[in-house]
């Protein structure tokens, strides 16, 4: 068998934008910056919020003239039948 074929397994830190620091191991040689973690992700916290780091949601809403609190009416299936 060949020797030294596996990469080194280093201890790194993952820094979340909420301030949480996660210590883990990886083959990377650098620390990570992440947007969400288990403490701030909407699935785990049970809250709904929009994570928009580049203004993409505002651009989309502006382009299609949508507001965040718009009431969407269900499409009547009877009108689509011929």
From Swiss-Prot:
Keywords: Metal-binding, Ribonucleoprotein, Ribosomal protein, RNA-binding, rRNA-binding, Zinc. One of its GO terms (molecular function) is structural constituent of ribosome. GO terms for biological process: translation. Belongs to the bacterial ribosomal protein bL31 family. Type A subfamily. Part of the 50S ribosomal subunit. Its cofactor is Zn(2+). It comes from Blochmanniella pennsylvanica (strain BPEN). Binds 1 zinc ion per subunit. InterPro entries: Ribosomal_bL28/bL31-like_sf (IPR034704), Ribosomal_bL31 (IPR002150), Ribosomal_bL31_A (IPR027491), Ribosomal_bL31_sf (IPR042105). The keyword rRNA-binding applies. This is Large ribosomal subunit protein bL31. Binds the 23S rRNA. GO terms for cellular component: ribonucleoprotein complex; ribosome.
């Amino acid at each position: 068998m060949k020797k030294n074929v596996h990469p080194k397994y280093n201890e790194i830190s993952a820094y979340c934008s909420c301030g949480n620091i996660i210590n883990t191991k990886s083959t990377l040689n650098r620390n990570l910056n992440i947007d969400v973690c288990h403490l701030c992700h909407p699935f785990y916290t049970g809250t709904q919020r929009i994570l928009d780091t580049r203004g993409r949601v505002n651009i989309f809403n502006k382009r299609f003239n949508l507001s965040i609190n718009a009431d969407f009416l269900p499409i009547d299936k009877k009108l689509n039948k011929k």
